[in-house]
């Protein structure tokens, strides 16, 4: 927003009306979605739409065959996003589909991790980063049981461009907030109630 952009300044100062749709980063939308600041007791003043990665078409495809859905094409942090959505939503169908997907794909990844390194490199692009962690943990367990003088720097089976959050040592470093982009994803919110919006959204113009 430019300092001299009058339209942007006025837009920033105007209160939001009921039915307004806005796109906000997930970290901000999440706080607003769980905040109970509405006039109606027990009801938040906003509602949210599930992101496209959690849309009905994706859920139905996961229910049909979890292994056939390229999760990474929808979101590199698919399960991280799903965890946030499940904390905000009570969609039982989504929860069941995600549980089935994780179990089915995790077992396939575990089997795939036993194969040669060159057979795995072509498949990383379609799996979630959590599954990459599981595969690396599986490989580390196998390497730890073999007598070898090589360090993991030369034995790591995962291409660096597919696992930027991993380190070349004997331990797995957990994902850090800076490693993920989940918090920057946009979530659509709807202002549901007709009461004035809180001061955190707008300020009254001086009269």
From Swiss-Prot:
Gene Ontology annotations for the cellular component aspect, listed alphabetically: GINS complex
Record InterPro entries: GINS_A (IPR021151), GINS_bundle-like_dom_sf (IPR036224), GINS_Psf3 (IPR010492), GINS_Psf3_sf (IPR038437), PSF3_N (IPR055221)
Stretches for region Disordered: 142-171
Localisation per UniProt entry: Nucleus
Subcellular location, principal: nucleus
Single GO BP term: mitotic DNA replication initiation
Keywords: DNA replication, Nucleus
Gene3D superfamilies tied to this protein: 1.20.58.2050
Pfam families registered for this protein in UniProt: PSF3_N (PF22466), Sld5 (PF05916)
Top-rank lineage group of the source organism: Eukaryota
Similarity remark: Belongs to the GINS3/PSF3 family.
Function recorded in the entry: The GINS complex plays an essential role in the initiation of DNA replication.
Assembly and binders: Component of the GINS complex which is a heterotetramer of SLD5, PSF1, PSF2 and PSF3.
Protein name, per record: DNA replication complex GINS protein PSF3
